[in-house]
Each structure stands twice: as C-alpha cells, then as structure tokens.
C-alpha cells in the first residue's frame, strides 16, 4: 500500500458516512494526485462543510496544507489552529512537545506512527498544532505518520462507541437504529438509481421504504417491526443491479 493510500484510508475512517464523505474522498484523491493546487480555496471549502467535527476539519486542513504546494507566507487558518490546540490543556501541550522531540529523531512514516500511538489523541492533536503553526518542522512522511496515529486513536474510540450501540440489548435503540439504516440505504438507492428509465423501479422501492419508516416513526410501532427492513431493501437493490448488469455483493 502506498503512503498516500494509507493516509487517505486513515483520514477517511474518521469521517462520518454520507455524501460529504464521498466528496472529501474525491478532494483527497485530487490533492494527492497533484490535481488540486489551490490551497486557499480548498481550506475555504473545508471550513464551511457541515457535520464534520472541528478536530476532523483540523486534521483534514493539516493534511491539505502538508500536501498542496503553497507560497511561504500563506496565512495559517484559525479554524485549524483552534482544532489542534489540544483543548487548551497544558498537559496536552507538554506531552506534545515531548512527542515532537521524539518525532524529530524519526525519518520514516511507520516509525513516527509507532512512536505516536502511545500518546493520547489530545497530545497528538497538539503536536500537529505545533507543526502546523511552524513552531517545529518534521519531514512530510513523519507528519503523515502522526496524522495516521491520531486517526487510529479517534477511530478506535468511535468503533468502541459504535459497538456498544450495535450490541445494546435496548429494543428501542435497536429499533431506531434499524430504521435509520433503512432510511439511509433508501437514500443511497435513490442516488445510485440516477435518472435512467429502468431506475423508476428502484426509486419506487426506495421511496416506499422511506414512507414506511416515516409512518412507523409517526404512529410509534413495536420495536421488532423494523427487523429485516434494511436487508429487504438491500436485496431489492441487488436484484435491480443484477438486471442492470452490475454485480455488487458487498452491501451487507
């Protein structure tokens, strides 16, 4: 796996799923391929994106700044600086300085990532802030190792939280989760169907599913009534794709 592929993988792992994730993936690909060279416009676009947490925006801003060539005097962006200040906690800053000294001795991406993984996400973000604010310099490879370690820490805690929700025995939470998943699957079906004539059928299935979820929420239904809703939808989507000559088995 190439270095940039690895960086893209880690960074996208902390972005919530949805149309915005697809858009960010495209920007990252363009930046890494050298197709997008306007850092100013890129940062302005990032700053105004909804849904993303300030820290995720800060990490993306850091990655864009590392990758896109820019004039030396280009201003650092406040939204990135604020996100990478370790919540203003002096302990984070102390640890960040110690980590920075260790990173200065590293020359490889994997070496830097290994060293960084033993620190908390707050200290890692502060260390990125040091480098972003030009208070310290490391090679781009080492900076990317720091980015990936930070994303791994964040993704780990997101995964723990997600697992808690998925394995919860509370029927109301499970019911709502199934309806949310069915609704987002329906939305994805509508987007994939596009505007071709054969798409009417898939659109109809998706639309009915969304109406059904709406009705279930409006009148309040038994928690088990949503079981299988998303799987039924995905089966419909796969049947539609087969007719269109597209084979995609990996939805479940």
UniProtKB/Swiss-Prot annotation:
A motif (Nuclear localization signal) lies at residues 101-105. InterPro entries: Flu_matrix_M1, Flu_matrix_M1_C, Flu_matrix_M1_N, Flu_matrix_M1_N_sub1, Flu_matrix_M1_N_sub2, INFV_M1. Residues 1-164 are annotated as: Membrane-binding. The keyword RNA-binding applies. Keywords: Host nucleus, Membrane, RNA-binding, Viral matrix protein, Virion. It comes from the Viruses. It is a peripheral membrane protein. It holds the Pfam family Flu_M1_C. Homodimer and homomultimer. Interacts with NEP. Binds ribonucleocapsid by both interacting with genomic RNA and NP protein. May interact with HA and NA. Cannot bind NP without genomic RNA. This is Matrix protein 1.
